[in-house]
């Protein structure tokens, strides 16, 4: 429990639950999963698959350690969703800004009608970016 994620804004975000055997959304939310600015990383945090947040106030997440002064700041803009995951027992964590999410199990509709699909009108731009800075 040495490492943690620090968000640059106070959060009150729901975790979108996934079915770990299929990777699909199961239609349920873990309400208020992320509270405040700190999320402690521990061995079981990803046992049920990724943490998926549809709405974050933050535009920066920093990986920090209680025992080491080094840190990695991950900045992002224009991404509506965010995923955080790691294989169980892995010595790393993946921070992924997303523009769209996986379907709920059993979805048979059109691609254009999928939940969280980003639509860009003709002659318009959709801009998003991310950067990383190590210290």
Regions found by a protein language model. Give the residues of each.
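Extended aliphatic helical segments
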Residues: 16, 52, 88, 93, ...
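Glycine-rich active-site loops that engage anionic ligands at enzyme catalytic sites
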Residues: 65-108
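Short alpha-helix capping/helix-loop boundary micro-motifs
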Residues: 111-117
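A short, acidic, flexible beta-alpha connecting loop/helix-capping segment that sits on the rim
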Residues: 99-101, 114, 134-135
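Active-site/ligand-binding surface loops and adjacent short beta/alpha elements
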Residues: 1-76
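Short Pro-Gly-centered flexible turn/kink motifs
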Residues: 118-134
């Amino acid at each position: 429990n040495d490492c943690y994620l620090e968000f640059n804004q106070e959060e009150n975000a729901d975790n979108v639950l996934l079915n770990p055997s299929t990777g699909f959304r199961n239609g349920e939310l873990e309400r208020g999963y992320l509270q405040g600015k700190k999320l402690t990383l521990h061995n079981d945090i990803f046992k049920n698959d990724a943490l998926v947040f549809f709405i974050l106030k933050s535009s920066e997440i920093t990986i920090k350690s209680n025992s080491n002064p080094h840190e990695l700041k991950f900045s992002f803009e224009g991404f509506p969703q965010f995923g955080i995951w790691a294989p169980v027992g892995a010595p790393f964590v993946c921070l992924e800004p997303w523009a769209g999410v996986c379907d709920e199990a059993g979805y048979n509709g059109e691609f254009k009608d999928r939940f969280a699909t980003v639509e860009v009108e003709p002659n318009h731009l959709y801009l998003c970016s991310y950067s990383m800075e190590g210290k």
